[in-house]
Structure formats: C-alpha cells, structure tokens
Amino acid sequence: MKTFTAKPETVKRDWYVVDASGKTLGRLATELARRLRGKHKAEYTPHVDTGDYIIVLNAEKVAVTGNKRLDKKYFHHTGHIGGIKEATFEEMIARHPERVIEIAVKGMLPKGPLGRAMFRKLKVYAGNEHNHAAQQPQVLDI
C-alpha cells in the first residue's frame, strides 16, 4: 500500500472563529499554529499547506501569566543606525493588540514560503467584529 500524500488542490479547508478573551497567549498560539499547519487532520503532509483558516476575536483581552504584562518586551528595528525600538506587552496591547497574537503564532510556524502561506490564513481582530461572515465560520473552543 502506498503512503498517502495530500495534494494542494484536494485539501479541504474550513473556517473557524476563536475567542481569545482570557486565554493564555502561548497556549492559544500553539493550538492556532497546530491548526494552521493542519496537524490535527489525518491527511497532514509536512510539505503541503493542509491547515484551516482561523479568525481570532478579542485579541486585546488575551492574558499572560506572571509579571509578563510589564516584563515581556517586543523589539523591532527601524532600519536606521541605533533604531532599535522596544515595547512592553502592555504597550503592544494598547497600540496593536492583533500583533501580539500574530507574533506569537508566526514564531511557531515554519520559516519560508510554506510558513508564510500558512500565516496568511490567520485573521486577528482586536474587537468582537469580523468581516468573514460569508465564509460561515464555525466556533472553535480552545
């Protein structure tokens, strides 16, 4: 019997909605990354994007344990000399709440073109509204 490998054109992708309110950031991100890769499916193939689309709501209400609200730092560089910028978790939640979840999930996905394709299937929103009603997403309880 031959080993089954999924073909990109035959993969069935579903849409899911996840509410991030009160969920721990890392535990939520690992489950999102797992589902974006498609590891929860029987037809998972490492070199094919078999994952589902995921909509994350209430990103501003995601939780972190311990003192990470003040201690966790996010860095980026402007491109100019001495242009390293840092922001705490609390500052990031105030300015760009979606980015906190996006950064956490992106770090857990493969690096390269396949990982970028998987990451594009993640839609994160700060509030409770999204514009993907036409896709009829199912509620995913994590």
From Swiss-Prot:
GO terms for cellular component: cytosolic large ribosomal subunit. Keywords: Ribonucleoprotein, Ribosomal protein. This is Large ribosomal subunit protein uL13. The keyword Nucleotide-binding does not apply. It comes from Edwardsiella ictaluri (strain 93-146). The gene is rplM. This protein is one of the early assembly proteins of the 50S ribosomal subunit, although it is not seen to bind rRNA by itself. It is important during the early stages of 50S assembly. Gene3D superfamilies: Ribosomal protein L13. GO terms for biological process: negative regulation of translation; translation. One of its GO terms (molecular function) is structural constituent of ribosome. It holds the Pfam family Ribosomal_L13. The keyword Ribosomal protein applies. Belongs to the universal ribosomal protein uL13 family. InterPro entries: Ribosomal_uL13 (IPR005822), Ribosomal_uL13_bac-type (IPR005823), Ribosomal_uL13_CS (IPR023563), Ribosomal_uL13_sf (IPR036899). Part of the 50S ribosomal subunit.
